[in-house]
Amino acid sequence: MGNDSNQAQARINALLDENSFVELQSLVTSRSTDFNLDAKKEPSDGVIIGHGLIDGTLVFVFSQNADVLGGTIGEMHAKKILSLYDMALKVGAPVIGFIDCGGVRLQESFDALEALGSVIERAADVKGVIPQLICVAGQCGGGLSVLPALADFTFMVDGASLFINSPDTITGNRSDECDTSSAKFQFEEAGTVDKIGSLDEVIASMRQVISMIPNDIVVVFSNTTVQKHQCFGAQLSSQSNCHIHT
């Protein structure tokens, strides 16, 4: 799996039941604007989204592709993730994300920043309404690092990095002495990550978590307000045996 030419798709295939994945919005690419006159039309704009099954349970998945423009976030890239959250919310299904990102696409300027902000806002809005699982599979820095913090369960693959600012920007700290972005530090010291390990180990834990999540979550819309008839957080906390085996 580690040598697969398309890591983003390989992660999805490893997570979901065989032949259950349905990709959505595969033809979406970046658009030309005043900020981005020479937009590159790259495959899926650097992120694969869709839905599939884990032991028969419906889940919605996004996976960033670091092979496309370094996995950077552009306007349409972020809007694809935003639309995935909206679809998952309508049916009360979990959202699972694989992050492998090179930051915001600077050439798209405020369009990319606004779209990224919308994703973070939506993740905050649905917290406790639908389950969110985030796996940092590569680099996750800057504004996108907020997304793992909002997730109900956060995972990191060995060798991945999670940070807002580079460790070297902290006075007196150097990454070769104390890499505060490493999976080991985030798990043992910061406590922001629930599970670390190889990709196979992390995916096994993610599948285990999905198997323990109630599948009768009902979300009712009232204008722009989301009402929680059966709150995911309340149901999950009531399950005393709900933990991740390490």
Tell me the role of every PLM-derived stretch.
Residues C135-C140, E177-C178:
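Glycine-rich beta-to-alpha transition loops that act as phosphate-gripper elements at the mouths
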Residues S166-S175, S182-Q186:
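Catalytic or ion-translocation cores adjacent to nucleophile or general acid/base/metal-coordination motifs
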Residues C101-G103, G138-C140, D168:
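Active-site-proximal loop/turn and secondary-structure-junction residues that shape catalytic pockets
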Residues M1-L133, L144-V146, L150-S161, T180-T246:
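Terminal-region recognition feature
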